[in-house]
Amino acid sequence: MASNRHLGRIISLQSLYEYEFRSKAGDASADIDSIVAKNIEPYAKALGDVDFVHDLTHGVFDEIEQLDKELQPMAPEWPISSISPIDRNVLRIGLFELTRRKDQVPPKVAINEAVELAKAFGSDNSSKFINGVLGTAYRNIWGEDNKKHAEQEKSKEEAAAAQTESKEGSEKTED
């Protein structure tokens, strides 16, 4: 069965949000493993790859403090604690995929998926906020890499154009 990663991200968001909510409410029984298992259960067949949900949720959960430190400079007007819990967890998931899964998830997919989560579960302006913050992260992280990539592509195009001109020039001299 094919993997449904979008659904997996929804379950991960739901689990992280539930854990945070229950913990802040003083629920000492809040356990991320049992929350994830409970949230996966109704969707296991449609989901396909349950390991994706576990890996994503635990990856974010294990690095929450570090992710929050990395997010803060990208939204300096908004202390992490003042961002809504949904938006905060969407940002964490998005940044985790951008920075820790860049070999598995293309950056634009990570940003788009986070924006879609924000549209579905956040407030009216959440998607714009998420897009802005993760767009800043993308530029900060890949700015120089993108510039190098663009230069390499331009060089390839110029080389191909020169080769084409060279071929055309040699064909004319043969006539």
Model-derived segments and their meaning:
Residues 1-120, 125-127, 131-175:
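N-terminal interaction/assembly modules
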